[in-house]
Amino acid sequence: ILTQYFGHTPKYYYDTAAMSRGLYPNMSARLKDCVVREFPSDLSKRKGEELVNAKGVRDLDPELDTQIGGYCIQDVDLTYDLFQSYITNYPCKELHLIDLTTRLFVEPKLLLDRSMLMQYKDEMVQRAQDAIEESGVEREVLSSQQKFAKHLESLGITVPTKKSPTTGKQIPAFGKNDPAYIQMCNMYPEHRALWDAREVVKSRIEETRAQRFIDSCNPDGTFGVPLRYYAAHTGRFGGTDKINLQNLPRGSTLRRALTAPAGQVLYVADLSNIEARMLAWLAKEADLLDAFAQGRDVYCEFASQIYGRTITKDNTLERYVGKTAILGLGYGMGHQKFQATLKSGSPSVDVSDSTAAQIVTQYRAMYPRIPMLWARMKDLLFNMMSPNSYGTTYGPLAVKSRALQLPNGMALSYPNLRYDAGQFLYNTSREMVRTHGPRLTENVIQALARIVITDQMLDIQSLPEVDVVMQVHDEIIAIGSEVNADVTMDKIIDIMRTPPEWCSDLPLDAEGGVSTRYDK
């Protein structure tokens, strides 16, 4: 409203909800909860409840008008008090990141191709209707777990099942990535129309997302990018406003509908396997670091170990197995989960129990310092509970009370961390969570990788040629003039290949491209 309706652009944006998520990532960021947490002894700093009195009331009487006015004033005062408390030790770079994240939404520079999305949505609706008609089964049967199971039984098909993660009981395994469901579909190819119809009915997400994109488009055709700062406790971004730009499939219509204005282009740059590189760096796994530094294909190299012959990029399936191993086994994944991951992936790869176990063993033997890192992370979990260990360091990390200080001044927090009956537990605002050495390793690596890419966002934003407009996982998207695009792209890639001071020997690599649409 302030920027797009009234035309007032603030010099700088602070966001106390975002700052709360950064300081207390496992806790609620609602103003009501924040003031209780920040000012536990000051009962005057408590959010009022007067707003409920105005629910459904269109015209406020003088008394209610005074109440709501006081409520609004108190909200502003409490928010400012929180800001004054939060700002004291909040890292400057993170404040710049909050400012940038806010501008992505309130000062949009991307355009949305509404006509493309409207046509796409209509096609999706028609495709669903055609699939349902071809299957000969009603939509309500296809969309219901219970009715679909009964329909399969009427066809003489045994319903695939899996263990419920919440109740522990056996339930129908109808997820499109459930191995038992995939196996059933492959066993009965004569019912392909039924499987296709079920997937279309249960996967209306594309249709729904297209409509949300359309609804979110501004009257001038611009599209504000809704990113949630510190959506995960590792600091990673997430979606908000019911729009998640973090999981747009490559080549999808939703992705290609995001465009640059005339005379401008999108600069899309992607950090190459940043987590695997960061893991090798923190573990001091020299062989893996050398491979990355020399630009060798680590996926092919590990696949060559698996298959006992030279694997190249031409061996797509074998390289995929090597890639899945490099990206998945670094966080303690066991052979059964690795087997299931290969089975449910694209392409789907079926390996035996013994083969999966052998690959896991090969990985841990080939890169022994990575399992050693898991053990060190277990030690750090104990250190976080021991006052005598506070202040000790491991690489760029410093031990605090139930937290690890990160090199950017933020922290990985584990509230109420404890060791009970042989397992580590901590609490979020919603649940109790179990953790262990490999899982802490994953948290640490993701947090460190996040710092690398968000610092790069700020560095790219400082370039006069471009404005950052989006960040997706390990990818940064900027917008700028089409003039001298190659030179601008080279500047962006140079930034993304330069490691920060706290890991100056980390071998980074990046690749990118230029387009008028987000189709890279």
Question: Each predicted region: which residue ranges?
Answer:
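A short alpha->loop->secondary-structure connector
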Residues: 3-13, 27-32, 285-289
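Conserved beta-strand -> loop -> alpha-helix junction used to position metal-binding or nucleic-acid-contacting
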Residues: 8-24, 295-300
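Active-site palm subdomain of RNA-directed nucleic acid polymerases
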Residues: 86-97, 452-476
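C-terminal structured "cap/appendage" subdomains that terminate the fold
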Residues: 460-511
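Function-dense linear segments that define catalytic or interfacial modules
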Residues: 226-311
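Conserved "right-hand" nucleotidyltransferase catalytic core of DNA-directed polymerases
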Residues: 3-4, 26, 34-250, 263-265, ...
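Short Gly/Ser/Thr- and Asp/Glu-enriched loop/turn motifs at secondary-structure junctions
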Residues: 15-16, 135, 143-147, 320-322, ...
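Conserved catalytic core of nucleic-acid polymerases
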Residues: 158, 224, 232, 307-464, ...
